[in-house]
A protein has these predicted regions:
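Transmembrane alpha-helix boundary/anchor motif
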Residues: 20-25, 101-106, 188, 204-209
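N-terminal transmembrane-helix/juxtamembrane module of multi-pass inner/ER membrane proteins
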Residues: 1-68, 108-115, 120, 127
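Juxtamembrane loop-transmembrane helix junctions in multi-pass integral membrane proteins
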Residues: 41-55, 79-83, 162-169
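Structural signal for the C-terminal ends of transmembrane alpha-helices
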Residues: 21-22, 66-80, 159-166, 209-215
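Aromatic-anchored segments of alpha-helical transmembrane domains
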Residues: 15-20, 96-101, 176-186
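Alpha-helical transmembrane segments of integral membrane proteins
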Residues: 53-61, 89, 194, 198
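Interfacial segments of alpha-helical transmembrane regions
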Residues: 70-110, 171
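Membrane-embedded catalytic cores of phosphoryl/pyrophosphoryl-handling enzymes
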Residues: 2-12, 128-229
């Protein structure tokens, strides 16, 4: 896990350096989805997909909470479907501190970065700002970073609690959901590429730190014989 943290921190620093030195990469990435009629991928079927992905983290933690309450009430649930309290704390803290506090409370309302649909390069009234500039004209719910992408990458947390034979495929699936959500946010003109990359990296770092603190080594996930969860 410490190796994962080092890798994630290094990727975050590298991402920051690349998009600070070449901020036009954000404009070029968003321009791939922009045409004469605006952001062409803003279509009903893709909006429906976005809505499903948006509510997926809430559905997942709701399912964990329901299973935990069911086990607490003595319902005859299979061992693999009986999460322990420490697992639920891990998931709840990850969702509250990552997509909740860090992204939506601290960053989005205080970084002042205009969204792609708001900047002059794509027909909006505001001036583009690189990710490291906090003097943009956006006032609230701004572009840096992507809340939906952060929530989607949080799904790595419950995926990491899967039984060992299923853990790697579950984590890979969660990462795929995160990447898909990030691409959709760029395609809709809601965020620049750096917004979604930072959202994913920040969330993965937080999940890794919480997992190190709350989940004991070699006693992870939904294992029924785990006395520590």
């Amino acid at each position: 896990m410490r190796t994962s943290l080092i890798i994630l921190a290094s990727l975050t620093l590298l991402t920051g350096a690349i998009f600070a030195l070449w901020p036009q990469l954000d404009l070029s990435g968003s321009a791939l989805f922009h045409g004469t009629d605006g952001f062409a991928f803003d279509q009903p079927h893709l909006k429906a997909l976005r809505a499903g992905l948006y509510y997926l983290p809430v559905a997942v933690i709701g399912a964990f909470a329901a299973a935990w309450l069911g086990a607490l009430m003595g319902l005859p649930l299979p061992t693999a479907l009986r999460p322990r309290g420490r697992s639920l704390v891990f998931l709840a803290l990850g969702l509250a501190l990552g997509p909740g506090l860090l992204v939506n409370v601290i960053l989005k309302d205080n970084w002042h970065r205009p969204r792609p649909v708001q900047v002059t390069e794509f027909g909006g009234p505001l001036e583009f700002r690189p990710w490291h500039r906090t003097d943009g004209a956006c006032v609230k719910n701004c572009s840096f970073v992507s809340g939906e992408t952060s929530g989607a990458f949080w799904l790595v947390a419950p995926a990491s609690l899967a039984p060992p034979p299923l853990r790697l495929p579950a984590v890979a699936l969660a990462l795929g959901v995160g990447l898909t959500t990030g691409v959709l946010r760029v395609a809709f003109g809601g965020h620049f590429p750096s917004d979604v990359l930072f959202a994913g990296l920040f969330t993965l770092i937080l999940v890794a730190v919480l997992r190190m603190i709350l989940i004991k080594p070699d006693k992870q996930g939904l294992r029924g014989d785990d006395p520590y969860l």
